[in-house]
Amino acid sequence: MKESERYEENQFKGRNRRLLNEWRRLEDRLEGRRDIQCEAVRRNTAGLPVRYLVRYNLRSICGVSDVEHLGEPGVCNTPLYASGYQMLIDIPDGYPSIDAPASFRFLTCDDKGRPMAHPWHPNIRYFGDFSGRVCLNQPDTYTDLAWCVERVAHYLRYDTYHAVMEPPYPEDLKVASWVIRQGEPNGWIFFDQE
């Protein structure tokens, strides 16, 4: 029995009913998958998840060989790879209203503050105070969390990315520039595609 099945939908209204449905969709869509696992790590007073930890067991780019000289002419920055990433999904109190979307952020440090591999992708912030933040252009407020989790898996595989300087602009302009100038021309972003 899935954990969400312990709850009856008719015992909830409004936001809590939406939270239950999101939880069920995540459990259904990710059931039996080895490449993506999801667990509830914080709950509200009704026992429904408001924070998830998503583990991606996918090979993806996690940086480049000479990041200190990124963008300098003549410097070849080959990609570095990792196979495990962790992302938090935080659901704010006003979710799912348009001004209270869920936030998606890859962990960049472990619980002791040591750096950990996080994705190098133009739609995921790599540098700065907001490193790890994921830019997801969701079609509408009815887009479920499971769609977002699967979309991020496409990001990690480089099946989907937006690196050109036009709307909706890339989340990380430095990574986007690398994708255009080195990643695409050298074929480095084309790996493990299904």
Predicted regions span which residues?
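UBC/E2-like fold recognition across ubiquitin and ubiquitin-like conjugation systems
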Residues: 1-84, 94-194
